[in-house]
Swiss-Prot record:
It comes from Mycoplasma pneumoniae (strain ATCC 29342 / M129 / Subtype 1) (Mycoplasmoides pneumoniae). F-type ATPases have 2 components, CF(1) - the catalytic core - and CF(0) - the membrane proton channel. CF(1) has five subunits: alpha(3), beta(3), gamma(1), delta(1), epsilon(1). CF(0) has three main subunits: a(1), b(2) and c(9-12). The alpha and beta chains form an alternating ring which encloses part of the gamma chain. CF(1) is attached to CF(0) by a central stalk formed by the gamma and epsilon chains, while a peripheral stalk is formed by the delta and b chains. Belongs to the ATPase alpha/beta chains family. This is ATP synthase subunit alpha. GO terms for molecular function: ADP binding; ATP binding; proton-transporting ATP synthase activity, rotational mechanism.
Amino acid sequence: MADKLNEYVALIKNEIKKYSKQIFNSEIGKVISVADGIAKVSGLENALLNELIEFENNVQGIALNLEQNTVGVALFGDYSKIREGSTAKRTHNVMQTPVGDVMLGRIVNALGEPVDGRGPIKAEEFDQVEKIAPGVMTRKTVNQPLETGILTIDALFPIGKGQRELIVGDRQTGKTSIAIDTIINQRGKDVYCVYVAMGQKNSSVAQIVHQLEVTDSMKYTTVVCATASDPASMIYLTPFTGITIAEYWLKQGKDVLIVFDDLSKHAIAYRTLSLLLRRPPGREAFPGDVFYLHSRLLERACRLNEEHGGGSITALPIIETQAGDISAYIPTNVISITDGQLFMVSNLFNSGQRPAIHVGLSVSRVGSAAQIKAIKQQTGSLKLELAQYSELDSFSQFGSDLDENTKQILERGKRVMEMIKQPNGKPYSQTHEALFLFAIAKSFIKFIPLDYIAKFKQRIMEEFDKEHPIYKEIATQKSFSEALEAQTNTAFKALVKRFVSALPDYDITKYGTMEELE
């Protein structure tokens, strides 16, 4: 009996030791109304903006409207069991997402929860989804190239690490293909990638993930997705989750590439939320702060100086236009935020010119400083030539009386356009790009019949493989010295002679003279 008594006394003493005077304050409110994924909650007077609110049945939401007597909460997931009078509880936490290397190779939703069926993510670190972008004094100028592996972009519209380059165009013009090819091309280059899919079909996301898996690119990539079947609140949150995951590696001094596919659907989701929250509509029914929505997101992509780690986030936002109208509200907003745009055109795409980038309307504002010298040396007047060709080509449709000079410009233009064609999923190395551009700049392509240009490109890659001394020197020096240029010129003359000699019924006098190849 005494033993039992001593045991009880010990237990009571132990509980007294644990006693704390600290008061845990739990704020609980009531749902006034719920409809279309928005709950009006009363009794949460001290709620924070973007705070996570918990409801019954494990439903969560984010506080977006803080009014005098109520809080407007956008709900995540199935809210069918939430009724008027249901309880809502503050979590005292603003929206957070897991970050770190554990996110690599995973597919997560807007809340950072895995949706790939590969079990939970054992993250040790979490970070706030909404943050202020790095300040001016922490940044550094963009001067390192981000290799896309796409000849047109690397030659004419180079992208630097830390740049924001918009990809804009109608549906089905190859916008996502450019972004995915760029991710694939980062293999072995120590660049982490984040692909953010917003409002897309489940089948489209699955297809992209499959393409990344087949090319062994998921090892360094995280996919953040909110598909068309997800509520507007999830689509709204997705890009902020993506950039937060990318910022973890930025702080580690790493280079990151993030793709937002696409911000048009993101703006529509935000418009939906804003109208349901009864915020006043503006132009095209978008709320007044839709510019700030995208500017605060894209300003988080930057290049930091050495004192802050020297990392970078390069952003490729995608915008879908209607009937090629880039002067609409959202496209003009994002064009003014970003450091350049690639304008994709339907008629080029349909005519087989892929990637279908419009040379005249596309621009890269800061990337030229990041372009390697070997490519810069060969692209002096190429953009002007292509713009001139484009103008003359449309003019030549109306009449057949063309002078000799115009015919030469058109013939050269056709060959250049054929040279910059590139199949999907086949990125080029920068050295091969420099060699293609050398062939264009030194007019070796004029000897090649139009139908054989693709085979000639293949032959260049076979001839100048990674073991070739010229390839090795360009890859090392990143520029053409006088000696290297002369050496490359001689090698190309020999290559062209061998190539055309194998063509059936080839007559060199139609294209030039044999003396030019001596």
